[in-house]
Regions:
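Membrane-embedded hydrophobic alpha-helical segments
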Residues: 7-63
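Membrane-proximal, non-transmembrane interface segments of integral membrane proteins
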Residues: 63-151
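Soluble C-terminal extramembrane regulatory/interaction domains of multi-pass membrane proteins
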Residues: 137-247
Length: 247
């Protein structure tokens, strides 16, 4: 109500100012013909001015809306990595045969530049997980994911993620892996074909989560240095990472 009243007062004030200016022009020059001429000339450009203002405002509103949506999405992504993602990456890393290259490329630090993040993303685009799984690891992943199943369901229901196809793909991959593991009472004595199937599901989720993790780290580095600091100190790719600040 207060906003509406403010707009009405603003409109009346601007209209009154226009009337006063034209009245002043007439009183000064005593030429009604020219006053009406210029008034109509100004009115002729009003539709064009309105169009330009509308286009500009629409552009600004779209930009603001996009920024707001991205901020909400990144908050949701942050919840995922805090509650599920970081721990899951730690398990995936244990299955990776070529773990040394992965750790070398993704040992993020507070000194990483935008260029270094881009190099990391290029590495991930060419990265193909080479995982080794056994009944013990499958059991650990099953226990970990089932304990966080409700968190995954809530994330899938979040409407803010509809515009983020890659992260949605990641959630579906993790959720599918969870379902596959849940429906197996035991992992002992599984045929080689079934182990290969689970290996493929693990590799799919693994590859997607690594890419989203690095993209999220870049976001934190740019916008939230204090959150990036703790992410560096809990980096699942760095076996020497420690939460305590030592220097």
């Amino acid at each position: 109500m207060s906003h509406t009243r403010w707009y009405i007062l603003l409109g009346l004030g601007l209209a009154s100012t226009s009337v006063m200016v034209y009245a002043l022009q007439y009183l000064t020059f005593h030429n009604a013909h020219d006053t009406i001429f210029y008034m109509l000339q100004d009115l002729a450009f009003v539709p064009v001015q309105v169009l330009l203002v509308m286009l500009l405002l629409d552009k600004l509103l779209q930009k603001k809306e996009k920024e707001s949506l991205l901020n909400k999405m990144n908050m949701t992504i942050g919840v995922f990595f805090s509650e599920v993602g970081t721990g899951l990456i730690s398990l995936f890393v244990e299955t990776e045969k070529n773990v040394s290259a992965l750790r070398s490329e993704l040992a993020i630090s507070t000194g990483w530049s935008a260029k270094r993040f881009d190099e990391g993303q290029r590495f991930i685009r060419d990265f193909t997980p080479d995982v080794t799984i056994d009944p013990a690891m499958l059991g650990r992943m099953k226990e970990y994911l089932l304990a966080r199943r409700s968190d995954l369901l809530q994330l899938l229901e979040n409407p803010n993620l509809l515009e983020h196809d890659k992260f949605t793909d990641l959630l579906w991959a993790v959720f599918h892996l969870t379902d596959e593991l849940q429906h197996r009472a035991s992992f002992d004595g599984l045929p080689e074909s079934d182990l290969n199937h689970l290996k493929g599901d693990t590799a799919r989720a693994y590859r997607l989560i690594v890419g989203e993790w690095l993209q999220y780290m870049k976001h934190l580095k740019t916008n939230y240095p204090y959150l990036y600091s703790i992410a560096v100190r809990t980096n699942p790719f760095n076996p020497d990472a420690q939460i305590e600040v030592t220097g």
